[in-house]
């Protein structure tokens, strides 16, 4: 890894972490459901799908921009550990329906958004 890539990852990571902090702070929970985490994971999934769609469809995305958005911004914006903790907390509180909804929503929505981003990159 060269220095330019490292700086791109660091800058993207800083912006992604700040975005996650503010988005999750605005929408932390809605009636015990962790909306903020679902939203940040969804945004990051769409962006990653779009970037890798561009690459797949033959559009050159410079390595430093891939590092900035992919590893840096999206890596810091999305959060599997918080999703896991929030799901565990719902289970601990015996909110079984909300825990199942959280798991289902995160998997279905984020995978769908990767697909949508991938397809939109073709246009």
Curated annotation (Swiss-Prot):
Residues annotated as binding Na(+): 75, 78
Regulation: Na(+) is not transported, but it plays an essential structural role and its presence is essential for fluoride channel function.
Ranges annotated as spanning the membrane: 7-27, 39-59, 68-88, 100-120
InterPro entries per the UniProt record, alphabetical: FluC
One Gene Ontology term, aspect cellular component: plasma membrane
Main location (coarse class): membrane
Pfam families cross-referenced by the UniProt entry: CRCB (PF02537)
Entry keyword set: Cell membrane, Ion channel, Ion transport, Membrane, Metal-binding, Sodium, Transmembrane, Transmembrane helix, Transport
Membrane topology, from the record: Multi-pass membrane protein
Reaction(s) catalysed (UniProt annotation): fluoride(in) = fluoride(out)
An example molecular function term from Gene Ontology annotations: metal ion binding
Any single biological process term in GO: cellular detoxification of fluoride
Cell compartments where the protein resides: Cell membrane
Family membership: Belongs to the fluoride channel Fluc/FEX (TC 1.A.43) family.
Function: Fluoride-specific ion channel. Important for reducing fluoride concentration in the cell, thus reducing its toxicity.
Protein's name according to its UniProt entry: Fluoride-specific ion channel FluC
């Amino acid at each position: 890894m060269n220095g330019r890539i490292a700086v791109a990852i660091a800058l993207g990571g800083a912006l992604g972490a700040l975005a996650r902090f503010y988005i999750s702070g605005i929408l932390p929970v809605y009636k015990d459901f962790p909306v903020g985490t679902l939203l940040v994971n969804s945004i990051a999934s769409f962006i990653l799908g779009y970037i890798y769609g561009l690459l797949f469809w033959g559009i050159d995305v410079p390595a430093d921009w891939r590092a900035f958005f992919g590893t840096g911004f999206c890596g810091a914006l999305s959060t599997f550990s918080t999703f896991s903790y929030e799901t565990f907390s719902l289970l601990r509180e015996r909110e079984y329906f909300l825990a199942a909804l959280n798991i289902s929503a995160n998997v279905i929505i984020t995978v769908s958004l990767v697909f949508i981003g991938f397809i939109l990159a073709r246009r």
